[in-house]
Every structure is written in C-alpha cells, then in structure tokens.
C-alpha cells in the first residue's frame, strides 16, 4: 500500500466535493502519509485563504498486543504528536465501542477533516 498516495487521493477527492473515509489499519501506517497530512490536508484552508476546506475522515487503530503482539513497529501511540502537529484536523481517540458510531457522526458533521483512532480495550488505560 502507498500510504502517502492514499492520503493524497483522499485530499483530492475532498477538494472535488466528496467526503472520503480513508483507512489505515494501524496508527503506525499513518506516519507514512505525514507529508500529505501535515503539509497539505491540514494547511489547504490556510494556503487557499479559506477558498478550499477539504474534509477527509481518517480511520485508524491503536491495536491490541494480546493474544498476538504486533511488535514495536505496529503498536506505537502517536496521539499527542498528531494533536500537536495538526491545527485544522480534529483528532479523536475512541475506546468505548458504544461511542464509535457517534464519533464518526460527529466527524461527518464537523465540516473539518478528522482522525478517529479506535483504541483497543487492552490499550485503553495505557493511552489516555
């Protein structure tokens, strides 16, 4: 998978009026799309002086380490780093299954790009 291309295509679709939902199976994979995310999607509204306001919903997961440990390359938590780098993109962490659907509804209605990080139950207490 070409993660940067995936984010670039999603941004392009958003500029064309669509609201794409793009999925990165692990939060670590989103790191490979950081140029498109930080330097393009997050800054397009500012760079275009408000003319363009692309909305992309990004789904990713901070996964379980039990029963199968994905190892250090697939279990990094970059939630706070994302919140620090992104000024025009909502970053949400969801750990309760009952609130996942509502979080996606909020992301859709927010009129802004959003990252929804689904946190597996065994990571919930470790990464608040």
Placement of each model-derived feature along the sequence:
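Conserved thiamine diphosphate
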Residues: 2-5, 11-128
């Amino acid at each position: 998978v070409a993660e940067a291309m995936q984010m670039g295509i999603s941004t392009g679709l958003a500029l064309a009026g669509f609201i794409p939902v793009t999925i990165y199976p692990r939060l670590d994979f989103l790191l490979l799309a950081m140029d498109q995310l930080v330097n393009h999607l997050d800054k397009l509204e500012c760079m275009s002086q408000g003319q363009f306001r692309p909305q992309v919903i990004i789904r990713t997961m901070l996964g379980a380490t039990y029963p199968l440990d994905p190892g250090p390359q697939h279990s990094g938590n970059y939630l706070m780093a994302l919140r620090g780098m992104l000024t025009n993109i909502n970053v949400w962490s969801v750990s309760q299954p009952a609130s996942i659907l509502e979080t996606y509804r909020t992301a859709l209605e927010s009129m802004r790009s959003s990252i929804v990080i689904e946190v597996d139950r065994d990571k919930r207490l470790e990464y608040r």
